[in-house]
Each structure stands twice: as structure tokens, then as C-alpha cells.
Amino acid sequence: MPTLLRVEQGAEVARAIGWHRPDWEDLTGIDGLGSDLPESRPGCGSLSVDPSRESELRRRFGQDRLRSRRIEVSALEDEQEAMIARGWSDGYPVVAPTEERVLAMLEGTERPADEIVAVVPPDLVPCSVEKVAVNAVLAGCKPEYLPVVLAALEAVCNDTFNMHGVQATTLGISPILIVNGPIRRALGMNAGVGVLAPGNRANDTIGRALQLVIRNVGGSRPGEVDRSTF
């Protein structure tokens, strides 16, 4: 991108950015500067100010907040099949947790990415905010859903609730989340009609995110610790 600087006594006093000859003339005081060139050219700008590149630039040049391991998927490999093959899915399609998406998800909370939210049964694995964000991306959550997912995980990962027992029993047991208050209205969650989530993204994905954390972080997979027959 054309950039002209005016320097006096070793210090910059003015600059002209972009392809616009009148600005060049004003800066230099030279009439007809570049007269053999077009007066202006549209779309001449730095990609660093392109709004569509914000997430990519934050990932590449911002402070690295992510500690999770990275997994490369080859160009010839279907990423959906790759995630399912690695056991990250509950059987339904999932959203690839790219660095950009996980960073965007973390914008939904002010809690540090490395804060331990809970020790997740049945394998009793410490789970950070970042790990919850990864699974929220997989589930299809929006960033504004993350606080509810975090609260739900804290609610079930304690001795009183006994999530380990829920996951290890042979009976067909599954937790139900009840969300109420201003955040329920802010997220547009179903209430009164369709409370079991059909067609509502918040209702569908918040519970799914919790289930994926229990599965992917806590290790509760059918046929392993999860012995439910229904």
C-alpha cells in the first residue's frame, strides 16, 4: 500500500496512506506529483485493517492464550470424519474447534482460559475454561452461551450431584439443566413451549456442550465407564 511520510529534523510530522494523488500533492507540496498515474485506486488498503481477518490476526499475532494440543488434519482428510474417528463426537456432526473459533468462544467469558473449572468424572480430570470452550465449539455454541456451560459444569461436578454415579450406572439416567433468569431471556432459550430444546440453538447446544465435556474430558464413553443399557 503506498505510504508517504514527511519527516522534519528526523521526526515524522505527516503521512499520506493509500492511493490518492491529491493527498500526495498536499503532503509534498508538489503539484502534478505522479500525474502519469491514476488519480486514485479503490480497495487499496492493508489486510491488517480488514474486519474479516480479525480472528486470524489475533490468532497469529496476539498473546497466545491457548494451551491445548494442536492436531493437524491433512488436506485429503475429511475433518468431520477425522473428529468422529478420534471420538470427539456424540454421534452427530460437530464443529471443528479451530484456534480462531476457540479464541472467539473465550470472548464469551472474563474468566482466565487456564482457570480450572471443575474436576470432571468419571476419570477425575481437571478441566480448564479453555477445554470447556473447545467442547462448546464442538457442540455448536455461541460465545454468549459459555457462561451457562461453565455454570452447568460446576453444578454437576461435585459430590452432592454425583456425576460419576450418573455416568457409571447401567440405568438410563441423564441430567436435565434448568436455566432461568435474565440470561435465559438474553439467550432466547425456549421456556413454556419447546422446553426440551427442539429447534432452539441455545437449548440444544448448551446441554450438548456439557455432555461433550463429560465425554471428552471426563472420559465417559458408552461401553467404557458409561455402562448404561438404554
Which role fits each region the language model picked out?
Residues 1-5:
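Structural micro-motif
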Residues 6-41:
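Non-catalytic, surface beta->alpha helical segment in thiol-disulfide oxidoreductase systems
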Residues 61-230:
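Non-transmembrane, aqueous-exposed alpha-helical and coiled segments at domain scale
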Residues 40-76:
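Flexible inter-domain linker/hinge segments
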Residues 22, 47-49, 169:
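Intrinsically disordered, low-complexity, compositionally biased regions/tails
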